[in-house]
Every structure is written in structure tokens, then in C-alpha cells.
From Swiss-Prot:
Similarity section: Belongs to the steroid 5-alpha reductase family.
A GO cellular-component term linked to this record: membrane
Keyword terms, alphabetized: Brassinosteroid biosynthesis, Lipid biosynthesis, Lipid metabolism, Membrane, NADP, Oxidoreductase, Steroid biosynthesis, Transmembrane, Transmembrane helix
Example of a GO MF term: 3-oxo-5-alpha-steroid 4-dehydrogenase (NADP+) activity
Name of the protein described by the UniProt record: Steroid 5-alpha-reductase DET2
Spans traversing the lipid bilayer: 13-33, 51-71, 79-99, 113-133, 148-168, 205-225
Regulation acting on activity, per entry: Inhibited by the 4-azasteroids 4-MA.
pH effects: Optimum pH is 6.8.
Disulfide cross-links: none
Subcellular location, record wording: Membrane
Length: 262
């Protein structure tokens, strides 16, 4: 009976993730989360960005520690290997990235992160963290699927690593530029910035595309689609922001997030 209830709960959570994407994309076409270059007043109290990132991303780590040991595949080396890229990404996002923000030392008075937005992100990470951890540790049933598991894992891992490299190096460039300009904004140049305004978002989408291939599941596909629904509208808004701010100086050949396409 408990197994049936757990499976029903998992399915409802998965459906929530999958169907949350389209309305999120529509909403973010008209309203951008007020942090970073889109920061604005009227969203209530704020907190230091490093603290916000640490707290709102943290469920991906501690929830995994709580859930994973109780899965049917918790001790399966393949499940542990499969989940490692997810944990590596979120260790960086929860620990390393906030530390990098903290060390950047640019003035933070006008750059507070709204607690309401952090709370929404925290809630999403609770939902998605549960889905991904529970799927890999308990509901995935093709670990013994011969060589297909390894083909999907290797191909997905190559895609994931490529995306993570683009994401991390682009984030590092943005943090460095903001530090050098005392919290101000300049036109990012070099690398993937020559092709798109937001290569950090492009890289993250590529990561979760690789994750979808590795997991070969609706859980992975749902995460990838929601990532695109969340980040691509923001990338488009950031692209327009750059053009409005820098006008003729901004490279006209750059796209928003997908090279040569969008």
C-alpha cells in the first residue's frame, strides 16, 4: 500500500514538473524575476545573492541524502554513477558558485536577491530534487538493459560535460566582469559570448539535455523542458536589455541563447 501511495505521489510530482513548463514560459515572456540585471524594487525584502543561491539550491543536495538510501537501486553502482553528474552540477551551484559570488566583493546594496524569488526557486528544487533522486534510486528499471545503458550514459555524459563547461566558464566570465567594474555591466566578449548573449543559460540547457539522454526518462525530459521554459525567456529579456543599454555598440550578430538560431 505504501509503495502504491509513493508511486502515485511520484507521478503527480512528475506531471507537475512537465506541465509547469508552458505556463512558466508564457509568464516569463512578460515578467522577469527581479535579480541580476533585471533587479527592481517592489518584490519585498532581499538577501545577499550568495546566501540566496546557497539556500535555494541546497535541497538538491540534502534531499538526495535523505531519499537516495531508501531506493531499491541505492546500492547499485550504475545508479550511483548515473546520479553523479547531477550531484556534481549542484555541488558547484550550491557551494562553489555562491563562494565565487561572495569573493567577487562588488557592492551588493542594490543587488539584493528577493526572498520571494529565492523561496520559489527553493520550492522548485524540492520538487525536482525529489523527482530526479527518486527516479534514479528507485523507479528506473533498465539498469540491466545490456549495452544500451552504457551507450546512453556515455553519449549523455559527453553532452552534459560540454554544457557544464560552457555554463561554468560563462558564469565565471560574468562574475569577473562585474567584479572588475564594481557591480556595473559591460559587454561580455570572447568565447561563446561572441555567439550569444547568455551562453551560461545555453550551457545549462545543454547539461540537462545530456541528463535526459543519460536517464532516458520523462523525469529527465521534464527537467530539460522546464529548464528551457525558465531560462530561454530570461535569455531573450537579457539580450534585449543589452541592446537597449549598449545600443550600437552591442554586436548585431549575437543571438539570445541558441547560436545562430534564437
Amino acid at each position: 500500500m505504501e509503495e502504491i501511495a509513493d508511486k502515485t505521489f511520484f507521478r503527480y510530482c512528475l506531471l507537475t514538473l512537465i506541465f509547469a513548463g508552458p505556463p512558466t514560459a508564457v509568464l516569463l515572456k512578460f515578467l522577469q524575476a527581479p535579480y541580476g540585471k533585471h533587479n527592481r524594487t517592489g518584490w519585498g525584502p532581499t538577501v545577499s545573492p550568495p546566501i540566496a543561491w546557497f539556500v535555494m539550491e541546497s535541497p538538491t543536495l540534502w534531499l538526495t541524502l535523505l531519499l537516495f538510501p531508501f531506493g531499491r537501486h541505492a546500492l547499485n553502482p550504475k545508479s550511483l554513477l548515473l546520479f553523479s553528474p547531477y550531484l556534481i552540477h549542484y555541488f558547484h551551484r550550491t557551494i562553489i558558485y555562491p563562494l565565487r559570488l561572495f569573493r567577487s566583493s562588488f557592492p551588493a546594496g542594490k543587488n539584493g536577491f528577493p526572498i520571494t524569488i529565492a523561496a520559489l526557486a527553493f520550492t522548485f528544487n524540492l520538487l525536482n530534487g525529489y523527482i530526479q533522486a527518486r527516479w534514479v534510486s528507485h523507479y528506473k528499471d533498465d539498469y540491466e538493459d545490456g549495452n544500451w545503458f552504457w551507450w546512453r550514459f556515455v553519449i549523455g555524459m559527453v553532452v552534459f560535460i560540454t554544457g557544464m563547461y560552457i555554463n561554468i566558464t560563462s558564469d565565471r566570465t560574468l562574475v569577473r566582469l562585474k567584479k572588475e567594474n564594481r557591480g556595473g555591466y559591460v559587454i561580455p566578449r570572447g568565447g561563446w559570448f561572441e555567439l550569444v548573449s547568455c551562453p551560461n543559460y545555453f550551457g545549462e540547457a545543454i547539461e540537462w539535455l545530456g541528463w535526459a539522454v543519460m536517464t532516458w526518462s520523462w523525469a529527465g525530459i521534464g527537467f530539460f523542458l522546464y529548464t528551457c521554459s525558465n531560462l530561454f525567456p530570461r535569455a531573450r529579456a537579457s539580450h534585449k536589455w543589452y541592446i537597449a543599454k549598449f545600443k550600437e555598440e552591442y554586436p548585431k550578430t549575437r543571438k539570445a541563447v541558441i547560436p545562430f538560431v534564437y
